Amino acid sequence: MQQKTDVILIGAGIMSATLGSLLKELAPEWEIKVFEKLASAGEESSNEWNNAGTGHSALCELNYTSEKADGSIDISKAVKVNEQFQLSRQFWAYLVKSKLIRNPQDFIMPLPHMSLVQGKKNVEFLKNRFEALSKNPLFQGMEFSDAPETLKKWLPLIMEGRTSNEPMAATKIDSGTDVNFGALTRMLFDYLKTKNVELNYKHSVENIKRTKNGLWEVKVHDMNSGKIEHHTAKFVFIGGGGGSLPLLQKTGIPESKHIGGFPVSGLFMVCKNQKVVEQHHAKVYGKAKVGAPPMSVPHLDTRYIDNKKALLFGPFAGFSPKFLKTGSNLDLIGSVKPNNVLTMLAAGVKEMGLTKYLIQQVMLSHEKRMLDFPAFIPNAKSEDWDIVVAGQRVQVIKDTDAGGKGTLQFGTEVVSAADGSIAALLGASPGASTAVHVMLEVLEKCFPSRMIEWEEKIKEMIPSYGISLTENPRLFQDLHTSTGRTLGLNEKETVHN
């Protein structure tokens, strides 16, 4: 028997949670069903231990600002990422203000974001970056210093025991955040439950196919009872993290062809000495080694997990053929199809450097990983640190005009059918931080005829929707202050509601 509904969301992560929340505000009468393979929400890529928890707004991530041939800095990508994070901030503030979610300090905390570099050339790059960003209102309040005494105040743990005379510099901005995406995801699904969204955990989606009358039929395995169910919907969103690509391929839509996925696993070192944890209070991003991929940017992060302060260092990359942490070793080989095999092979040839890098990373022992610490913590002791396996990220491989056949993509990407009846989210960073922007893109692609009708409500929830904050500094200032107040970020006050 087929069970009909309006919307099916596959995967109970931050993306489905965000899209479901937007739809329930815009079209409250629509029936929504969620299917999640695991036992609860936010357990894969959205889980707090499976991602870096950075509110990515390009305040400290150096890979969002590239150096041009003439030495000037291109800040366009940084501005774009920051603008996108502001949309998330505004939507979260709307949810808190409307009492749809409570206690924002359980998912977002104010935390300085810093960039740290060593060596004369890198110091020059950071100074140029600081000067370029400082002209933009989104980055106001950023400070730069190459004075050792200032760096000792900003970064006591990092500067302690440092003997090298090599030039160092840092930038610091206090408006950064640490975001617990696992906690936020669980809050959003708790809210959706009150809106009669049907949440089905331990339900694995086995197949997706088009019916004769233009609906989508989703075949679901109920892992609790062992039964197979068939559900139909007018619109399906595939938000299954690394598991999205295999499901997208099952749809057979033309847009799913010539796309591959390359899985990369991440490892972090977590500090178990609370005295060391208390000596650091920032997210500090360094610069990737020459030739290393963007996902290898080292960072030392204060995190707030279960309302307790933690300290993580990494990431160290790894390789596993699984597309999900809880996936199968056959995921990668199973994703190779006649329509994408040449794309995948081309990427294999192009990305020999990445493959070599990942093999080297996999071979690292605990003690070898500790050798990466002196750049960040000269006095780090091996016994103070344990390894934590983070989530899998599946980088998109596709044919592009700029990069040619088999080009590895490092962002997130929405793939949708021409008629807007189904969409999938592929890719990785900046991911969760830009969830609201990405899900608005899904709405624009899949419900174009409803956008005029929905615009007023969208602007009530997300006031800067469709507006450049860079070009409207006054609006940015007003929204930054008001959302900061609602989310408890302006001062470290606790918001109870």
UniProtKB/Swiss-Prot annotation:
State the Gene Ontology terms under molecular function.
Answer: L-malate dehydrogenase (quinone) activity
Q: Which UniProt keywords apply?
A: FAD, Flavoprotein, Oxidoreductase, Tricarboxylic acid cycle
| Alphabetical list of InterPro entries matching this protein | FAD/NAD-bd_sf, MQO
User: Hey, which pathway is this one from?
Assistant: Carbohydrate metabolism; tricarboxylic acid cycle; oxaloacetate from (S)-malate (quinone route): step 1/1
Please name the SUPFAM superfamilies in this protein's record.
Answer: FAD/NAD(P)-binding domain
Tell me which EC number(s) this protein carries.
1.1.5.4
Name any cofactors this protein relies on.
FAD
One cellular component GO annotation, for this chain's record? Answer: cytoplasm
Q: Which GO terms describe its biological process?
A: tricarboxylic acid cycle
Zinc among the record's keywords?
no
Reaction catalysis annotation = (S)-malate + a quinone = a quinol + oxaloacetate
To which protein family does this belong? Belongs to the MQO family.
Supply the name of the protein.
Answer: Probable malate:quinone oxidoreductase
Task: Say which species the protein is native to.
Answer: Bacillus cereus (strain ATCC 14579 / DSM 31 / CCUG 7414 / JCM 2152 / NBRC 15305 / NCIMB 9373 / NCTC 2599 / NRRL B-3711)
Gene assigned in the entry: mqo
